[in-house]
Amino acid sequence: MAQRKMIVFPTKNELSEAMAEYTANLSAKFIKEKGLFTVVLSGGDLIDWLCKLVQPPYIDSIEWPKWHVFWVDERVCAWEDPDSNYKLAMEGFLSKVPIPDKNIYAIDKHLAADGNAEHCATLYEECLKNLVKEKIIPISKKTGYPEFDLQLLGMGPDGHMASLFPNHPQINEKQKWVTYITDSPKPPPKRITFTLPVINSTLYNLMAICDKAPAKSVAEIMKHNNLSLPSAHLSAQVENVWYLDQAAASEL
């Protein structure tokens, strides 16, 4: 699996520009190779940092109709709830690019509104397995798990990624592709999340971290490989790259 690689940018704006270029280059590569591009999003500030993709030159050069979009984790709430990662991504990014609705794979609308985390996780995993049958997502010959092209991740101040939190058992799940949590230390408490083997089966993982709040966790991972922090377990099949701004790297 890919070793962790770190790049520090002077400003958040330069990080955002680099993320857009990285994403656009991989989009072109995979669409040329296989005719589609599978992208996994997370929530939080990440969507704001994707703003460069909806500006020239990327807005016009990317083959958006060939994108297939997923979420590494989601809050179990109504789509229109302010906590929804789907709502965040739609308003800040997806509504501004011509990706077909059928290529956007959100949490089940009705189960999410009902707050049923376990059923939401089961149904999202079934969705992924159906897309394997349809040859949208391959199964990795190396890992035996679904193989996405690019995953864009963020890390919380406590070192969590997706909805895999410190001192919670979900980090150890190896059978399921998608699991759930009902006692998230960060509200809202109910969430679904890709399991660690699925996250690490992705070809290219880009972890983007900005601001001072996560700096201590960044240092714990980069200096000491502190495996009590879920983000320290991040890997990838081809590239595991961490983009930091100066504030996030300030404890290194």
UniProtKB/Swiss-Prot annotation:
InterPro entries for this protein: 6-phosphogluconolactonase_DevB (IPR005900), Glc/Gal-6P_isomerase (IPR006148), NagB/RpiA_transferase-like (IPR037171), PGLS (IPR039104)
Entry GO MF terms: 6-phosphogluconolactonase activity
Substrates-to-products reaction catalysed: 6-phospho-D-glucono-1,5-lactone + H2O = 6-phospho-D-gluconate + H(+)
The family this protein is said to belong to: Belongs to the glucosamine/galactosamine-6-phosphate isomerase family. 6-phosphogluconolactonase subfamily.
Subcellular location: Cytoplasm, Cytosol
GO cellular component, one term: cytosol
Protein name as it appears in the record: Probable 6-phosphogluconolactonase 5
Pfam family, one: Glucosamine_iso
GO biological process: carbohydrate metabolic process; pentose-phosphate shunt
Role this protein plays: Catalyzes the hydrolysis of 6-phosphogluconolactone to 6-phosphogluconate.
Enzyme Commission (EC) number: 3.1.1.31
Pathway noted in the entry: Carbohydrate degradation; pentose phosphate pathway; D-ribulose 5-phosphate from D-glucose 6-phosphate (oxidative stage): step 2/3
Annotated knockout phenotype: No visible phenotype under normal growth conditions.
Sorted UniProt keywords: Cytoplasm, Hydrolase
SUPFAM superfamilies assigned: NagB/RpiA/CoA transferase-like
Enzyme class: hydrolase
Secretion signal span: none
